[in-house]
Amino acid sequence: MNITIGELIGNFILVAGSFLLLIVLIKKFAWGNITSIFEERAKKISDDIDSAESARKNAEVLEQKREEALAGSREEAATIVETAKETAEKNKASILADTTEEVSRLKQKANQEIAQSKAEALRSIKGDVADLSIDLASKIIGQTLDKEAQSQLIDSYIDKLGDA
């Protein structure tokens, strides 16, 4: 295979011409499509980056809202606990006051019942003492006193006993 310089130069010119023709054809028919594909791809990448940035900002806003809601919930929980404590204290005071009032009322009722029982016992004792005194006086004196005189005598005697 002997190739001469003329053939080499001819082949070179043919290949170079074909290459230049191919470049011109690509430039005329395909270059616009190729550049538009690259531009669309660059635009899509740019839009995706913008969309990701927007999503990140939205996520930050949502995170901030969640933090605010959580803080609000904590504050509301603290308020509920404080209100419950205050209500419990009020109920405690009310129950304590009611209990104290009930104890006082029961004491007063017991004192009244004691006083009433004491008065009834004294009346009963007065009657018994009066009867015994009349019997005793009748036996000692040997005579019968009329009821009014006996009653006055007994009342004065009982009053003296009550004062003692």
UniProtKB/Swiss-Prot annotation:
Spell out the InterPro entries in the cross-references.
ATP_synth_B-like_membr_sf, ATP_synth_b/b'su_bac/chlpt, ATP_synth_F0_bsu_bac, ATP_synthase_B_chain
TM spans (from-to): 5-25
Q: How does it sit in the membrane?
A: Single-pass membrane protein
Q: Keyword set for this entry?
A: ATP synthesis, Cell membrane, CF(0), Hydrogen ion transport, Ion transport, Membrane, Transmembrane, Transmembrane helix, Transport
| Gene Ontology cellular component list | plasma membrane; proton-transporting ATP synthase complex
Q: What is its main location?
A: membrane
- UniProt GO MF annotations: proton-transporting ATP synthase activity, rotational mechanism; proton-transporting ATPase activity, rotational mechanism
Where is this chain's protein located in or outside the cell? Cell membrane
Going by the entry's taxonomy, the superkingdom of the source organism is recorded as Bacteria
Subunit field text: F-type ATPases have 2 components, F(1) - the catalytic core - and F(0) - the membrane proton channel. F(1) has five subunits: alpha(3), beta(3), gamma(1), delta(1), epsilon(1). F(0) has three main subunits: a(1), b(2) and c(10-14). The alpha and beta chains form an alternating ring which encloses part of the gamma chain. F(1) is attached to F(0) by a central stalk formed by the gamma and epsilon chains, while a peripheral stalk is formed by the delta and b chains.
The function of this protein is: F(1)F(0) ATP synthase produces ATP from ADP in the presence of a proton or sodium gradient. F-type ATPases consist of two structural domains, F(1) containing the extramembraneous catalytic core and F(0) containing the membrane proton channel, linked together by a central stalk and a peripheral stalk. During catalysis, ATP synthesis in the catalytic domain of F(1) is coupled via a rotary mechanism of the central stalk subunits to proton translocation. Component of the F(0) channel, it forms part of the peripheral stalk, linking F(1) to F(0).
Q: Which family does it belong to?
A: Belongs to the ATPase B chain family.
What's the protein here called?
ATP synthase subunit b
Q: Quick one: which gene encodes this?
A: atpF
